[in-house]
Amino acid sequence: MLDRWREAFLLIKLKNVHKRFGHLEVLKGIDLTVPKGEKLVIIGPSGSGKSTLIRCMNGLEEVTSGEVYIDGQLMTHKTRAALNRQYSSMVFQQFNLYPHLTVMENLTLAPVKLKKVPKAEAEALAMENLKRVGLAQKAHVYPTTLSGGQQQRIAIARSLTMKNPVIYFDEPTSALDPEMVQEVLDIMIELSHDDVTMVVVTHEMGFAREVADRVVFCDGGHILEQGTPEHFFTNPEHERTKAFLSKILR
């Protein structure tokens, strides 16, 4: 009975997930659960499998073996596209905005085309989210006229406009000039107060300390350690975690 109660609160579950690209095994038996509403931050060195992990979680990549469940539903070759549309939004490193569409058109394209939301309703919601990220005045300009920080804030507004229960962030500040990083982090910190589930790959340790319910450390395709920010940053258990933090927290 207790196990069934716990399962009811899980949004994402990975069981023994492996992912290979040719002969290269990037994920090596990942087990991970994410409860509804959790703010999960994934950290680790470059090449550790972090980005591949979240792309397998949301169905952008098909796992080589193992199982991925979204809200209790097994993700398969046939179901993963539909589950991705229904449950997941993604904020990428490189913004991935359509340069030939206005900001408003970028935000409303997927809700109208994929979710069949009436255009007027989608535009009203998009404007709400543009106001939230402080860019309502940019609704009818093209992305190429905006700074990198503004484009990433637009990408966050786009993810909110889908109204999906989980938002994935794949190193959302890594392509930004240093002076633009904080404006994006501030939006993400504000968003963390919502009920939405957030899965964030980042090198921003201050953000992880402030926002995460749990921090996961990946290395070599494995999850080596996980815990609350307080425990993870002040009393890590694994020697590899200690070595990583000693370099990145200098």
Q: Model-found features: residue ranges?
A:
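Short, Lys/Arg-enriched N-terminal segments with co-localized hydrophobic residues
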Residues: 2-9
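Absolute protein N-terminus
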Residues: 9-11, 250
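ABC family nucleotide-binding domain
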Residues: 11-229
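C-terminal boundary and immediately downstream tail of ABC-type ATPase nucleotide-binding domains
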Residues: 224-226, 230-250
